[in-house]
Amino acid sequence: MGTNCGCCKPPNIRHPQPPAIVTNNPPGPEKPQPIQTYKKYNLKHKFECSDNITFLLELNNKKLMTGSSNGTIAIYNLDNFELEYSIKEENKILCLLEFEPNMILTGTQSELINLYNISQNKKIDSFKGHLLSVNCLVKLNAKYFASASNDKDIRIWNYYNRSCERILKGHNNNIFCLIQLNNKSQICSGSADKTAKLWDWETGKCLGTLPHQSWVKSLCQLSDGSIITGGDDKTIKKWHGYKCGETFNEHKDSVKCLCNIDNKYIASGSFDNTIKIWDLTENKCVQTITEHNDKVICLLNHSKGYLISCSNDKTIKFWKLD
């Protein structure tokens, strides 16, 4: 039948409809949907400790350094999982930083940042300026490092002349976490003032703020520039610039630590005693590790192929993909 152009009215002719075709053939099989499979982390090794481990740090691609609540700094060889040596600090270890080979900076519950030569088991010097506990240490380049404290300040230090060259002010409560961003000239801090802040550490300028509902306790960054935050509101947020793109809310307590595994997956450790592995492409949790019996405090993606966790259950656990 031709198209009615509307210029003339077609005759009113009724055409018989063809009979419906009835078939008893069953519908064809549905195509199976592809099933995404994920490798799982399994426990490969465990250290039983005499005190709570508070920090994990990789050394020389094959060693692990730990800090503990009784002030002990221990160095393990992960080729044989043997303790090589240890150093005793006077205060609870909150963070560790290797600035150059054998030279370790410690942040503790005192206001001092101490420098140790671990090969000589000797304290070399102290960096003085903070007024309260030093929670974070980050190496910025071959000359400078940054520290963050419960005194609400971030300090930029010249490692070689032991001087503070800049103080970054803007948070109004304790600062819990600090990372250097991919472009190297910027850092990001997380605070009990319910924000994460981006800074140009070379000028001291605050570049922007990422809001949370509660304390921000953990940070990491992906290779595409996205920042991941976690905190006491039990959520993990993925930020695209200054806009929150995705929120993950499966933890039942504070998210204490975050670890970038390979830019597609991250791990989170929580006060709910669990570690969760997240697929950031699918935006979902693909594994929950429940083998810790107390709060998960720190995570480390070690170049030996281990995801390492420590907990207030006084254990360090080594996980590997199978």
State what each model feature region is.
Residues 32-50:
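A short helix->beta-strand "capping" segment at the edge of beta-propeller domains
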Residues 46-53, 87-94, 127-134, 168-175, ...:
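WD40/WD-repeat beta-propeller blade N-cap
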Residues 58-61, 98-101, 139-142, 180-184, ...:
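Residue-level detector of Asp-centered blade-edge/turn motifs that repeat once per structural unit
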Residues 67-70, 107-110, 148-151, 190-193, ...:
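Conserved strand-to-loop turn within each blade of WD40 beta-propeller repeats
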Residues 73-76, 113-117, 154-157, 196-199, ...:
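WD40-repeat beta-propellers
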Residues 78-81, 118-121, 159-162, 201-204, ...:
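Short loop/turn segments that connect beta-strands within beta-propeller blades
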Residues 297-322:
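Blade-level signature of beta-propeller repeat domains, shared across WD40, Kelch, NHL, RCC1
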